[in-house]
Amino acid sequence: MQAPEFILLRHSDGYSAAARWWPGTATRDPEAAVRNARGAVLYLHGIQSHGEWFETSGSRLAEAGFAVLMPDRRGSGRNERDRGHAKSAGRLLKDAAEWMDELRRRSGCDGVHVVGVSWGGKLALNLLREGRLPVASLALVAPGLFPIVDIPTAEKLRVGWSALANPRHLFDIPINEPEMFTATPQWLAYLRHDPLRLRQVTASFLLASRRLDRFTRAAHRHPGVPVALFLAEHDRIIDNERTRRWLRALPWPSRRIVEYRNAHHTLEFEPPGCTFVDDLVSWIGTQKCNA
């Protein structure tokens, strides 16, 4: 497995975010990168997770020749400052746009393939709202567009009040049981002892997340990009059927749906025999890298 380089990405508001970087066949010389890089991949993790969960697929993409940037979202993973907090949906989108700019600068590629896992699928989809962003394709991995699990109604009222009075007040993420992510013993043990796993987010973050949901309903009005949807049969976090119906209704140029039998939410954690990582690398490899 190809180990990533650990880097810091400085955002326009001064926040420094940790990230994993695999140059693939790209180099730091932009001209050489254009000649050699197979493409560029921005990899977005979920609400609780961080880049370490997805190093296997990041490494495999790099071994296939892609330059891969896998940031830890502000307030999550290796980022200790402002744990669980985001000021607004606009700030989250600005961060992602800045990641894309950095990836294009490092790789020399014009377009960017975006992979969004779980909650990261919501952020990935919202990048299409910004018509100027060079999204070449979209891989949605068990995306959190239609969750089964939600905050209780009474808790939502407290979130709404806190968003006005105390936006940094923390609330539990309602998917804290490791068994919701995987049934693989090795990874269950990992999740139980993962010190970087995010278990709470602020009222401000929850409000920002809710605002990102709006584009899911409006996505059919966007010309779209090639998209692949990867689902787990036994997902306890997202509604697979609603997600499938949503994708099939999109008038986008290319849509693919793959569901893995007996699999659980975090496909990365499935035991040997699951072809998810191979399928992800293969599908991205068939997409044009120009947006």
Where are these regions (language model features)?
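Catalytic active-site module of serine/aspartate enzymes centered on a nucleophile-bearing elbow/loop
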Residues: 256-291
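Conserved alpha/beta-hydrolase
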Residues: 58-81
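Short beta-strand/loop motif that positions the catalytic acidic residue
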Residues: 223, 229-231, 235
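Catalytic nucleophile-loop/oxyanion-hole region of alpha/beta-hydrolase
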Residues: 48-51, 77-110
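Active-site glycine-rich loops that stabilize anionic/oxyanionic intermediates
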Residues: 38, 46-49
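Short alpha-helix in the alpha/beta-hydrolase fold that links the catalytic acid
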Residues: 225, 239-248
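N-terminal cap/lid segment of alpha/beta-hydrolase-fold proteins
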Residues: 1-33
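Alpha/beta-hydrolase-fold enzymes
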Residues: 117-202
